[in-house]
Design a protein with these regions (language model features):
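Nucleotidyltransferase catalytic core that binds NTPs
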Residues: 1-310
Length: 310
């Protein structure tokens, strides 16, 4: 345990023999840094949550309360303001009972993005390092959001270390996924099992949801066989902030990448006001995708395209 760990003094004082001095709160940053250090020893002191904006509140674990960390996994190919809008709304309005203290964005690996495109030729796949950078550098992403940049294969071990470290210090921590209404609808329901969660939170902050009354006729006659009932809790956080911004998706962004002239790509006719850190993205596109007009922006069915985009 490092000397600056929030419970270092507690352990030096004698552990359980001095339980009366146990800290009621502790910064989540320390626990993430410790768990992450095993993945990347060179980044032991890498910053976790940004502190460059006003009114920053460091995510704190609270003893005796549920502490929820939401997992926002997706393609982010590329990330756009809808992602930021969804995270911001859920973090602020998820409910006091959940006590959501932070979110972790998990851009999926390049290989999974390629699988999503099926048999599409020359698909637009932004490298994970770029997608991570666009999410981290965007001022629209809330300060209590951390971007996980390691391979997906390392995620579950990282989470286990993080969870074990937090609980061993006397705190309770829960993980739940967050998705947009394109993943939870009348027709289908997102399963958070891939991320070892049994709870998910959804909001129509970024686009309308078809399960909200008044969207259209929701009752249909269907016949089928139900095999097993998975344990799943869904929390819906409705948008209550007035008129939404126009819908946008990563697919829309890729279509613009293919179709926009180089002189318009960085303007409002292109990616400005839609993609996160659009200037950084445009620079990369112009440098790395000289033949972008010939690239595929949307998946083509063939092999499995089960990796959902968010």
């Amino acid at each position: 345990m490092s000397a600056d760990h929030p419970f270092a003094a507690y352990h030096r004082a004698g552990g359980t023999a001095r339980a009366e001095v146990a800290i009621a709160t502790a910064p989540l940053t320390h626990y993430i840094q410790e768990a992450y250090h095993e993945l990347d020893p060179a980044d032991e002191e890498a910053p976790i949550f940004r502190d460059d904006l006003e009114h920053t509140v460091e995510p704190l674990l609270r003893r005796g309360f549920r502490n929820t960390i939401i997992l926002a996994a997706g393609g982010y190919n590329p990330p756009h303001y809808g992602h930021a809008e969804l995270l911001t709304h859920v973090l602020h309005h998820g409910g006091e009972d959940l006590n959501i203290i932070a979110a972790i964005m998990i851009p999926i690996d390049d290989t999974n993005l390629k699988r999503k495109f099926g048999i599409a030729e020359n698909p637009i796949i932004l490298p994970k390092s770029l997608r991570v950078s666009l999410c981290r550098n965007s001022p629209l992403i809330p300060n209590n959001v951390w971007v996980y940049d390691q391979p997906e294969t390392e995620w579950h071990a990282f989470r286990s270390r993080l969870e074990a470290s937090i609980t061993s210090s006397g705190f309770t921590v829960n993980f739940m996924t967050v998705v947009g209404p394109d993943h939870i609808s009348i027709a289908s329901v997102h399963s958070p099992a891939r991320w070892s969660c049994s709870e998910t939170i959804v909001s129509d902050a970024c686009r309308p949801a078809d399960f909200v009354a008044g969207h259209h006729k929701n009752l249909e006659t269907r016949c089928g066989t139900v095999k097993g009932v998975p344990e799943l809790t869904i929390r819906f956080v409705p948008w209550t902030e007035g008129q939404r911004k126009p819908n946008v998706s990563s697919t829309d962004m890729r279509k613009l990448i293919v179709s926009c002239d180089a002189t318009e790509l960085g303007s409002t006719k292109g990616l400005a006001g839609k993609a996160l850190c659009h200037e950084e993205l445009v620079q990369w596109i112009l440098r790395e995708l000289p033949e972008r007009a010939k690239m595929s922006a949307v998946p083509v069915k063939g092999e499995s395209t089960a990796v959902h985009e968010w």
